[in-house]
Design a protein with these regions (language model features):
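Conserved N-terminal beta-strand and adjoining loop/helix that marks the start
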Residues: 1-17, 37
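Conserved hydrophobic "DFG−1" position in protein kinase catalytic cores
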Residues: 11-12, 19, 85-87, 102
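Conserved Nudix-box catalytic region and its N-terminal flanking loop in Nudix hydrolases
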Residues: 16-54
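Hydrophobic packing within well-folded, soluble alpha/beta domains
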Residues: 44-53, 65, 83, 100, ...
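Short secondary-structure junctions
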Residues: 55-62
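Active-site-adjacent beta-strand/loop module that shapes the phosphate/pyrophosphate-binding cleft
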Residues: 59, 69-91, 101
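NUDIX/MutT-family hydrolases
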Residues: 84, 93-124
């Protein structure tokens, strides 16, 4: 089974967390924390800065590491490195996603997160 290595940013603003809804592909309409694939030679932090600039037109500061999720989807294995992030410049623009929401801790279960991201939500809820 093919392994895909990605990064995800849990963007925080006070007690709110930014989630995005996929607008394309096999998992269209599923909710996730934004990010994407690592390119050769990139650190996870560098990939996250690049991906969030490409997807949301924002500059971020990568903060604390949350966890690495290992998840088997039907067609591939996902390794996802997750970090808390803070917006340094810009307002998120949906360049690749169809929707986005700022969610409180209590609202995190109000959207249909993709399975790997559900693991991140559980970790966040344990920390707060």
């Amino acid at each position: 089974m093919k392994t895909i290595e990605v990064v995800a940013g849990v963007i925080r603003d006070g007690e709110k967390f930014f989630a995005t809804q996929r607008g394309y592909g096999e998992f269209k309409d599923g909710w996730e924390f934004p990010g994407g694939k690592l390119e050769p030679g990139e650190t996870p932090e560098e990939a996250l800065v690049r991906e969030l600039k490409e997807e949301l037109a924002i500059d971020i500061l990568v903060k604390d590491f949350i966890c690495t999720v290992e998840y088997d989807y039907p067609k591939f294995h996902l390794t996802m490195h997750c970090f808390y992030c803070e917006i340094q410049r810009g307002t998120p623009q949906l360049l690749e996603h169809e929707n986005a929401k700022w969610l409180s801790l209590a609202e995190l279960n109000s959207v249909n997160f993709l399975p790997a991201d559900v693991e991140v939500v559980k970790k966040i809820k344990r920390e707060f």
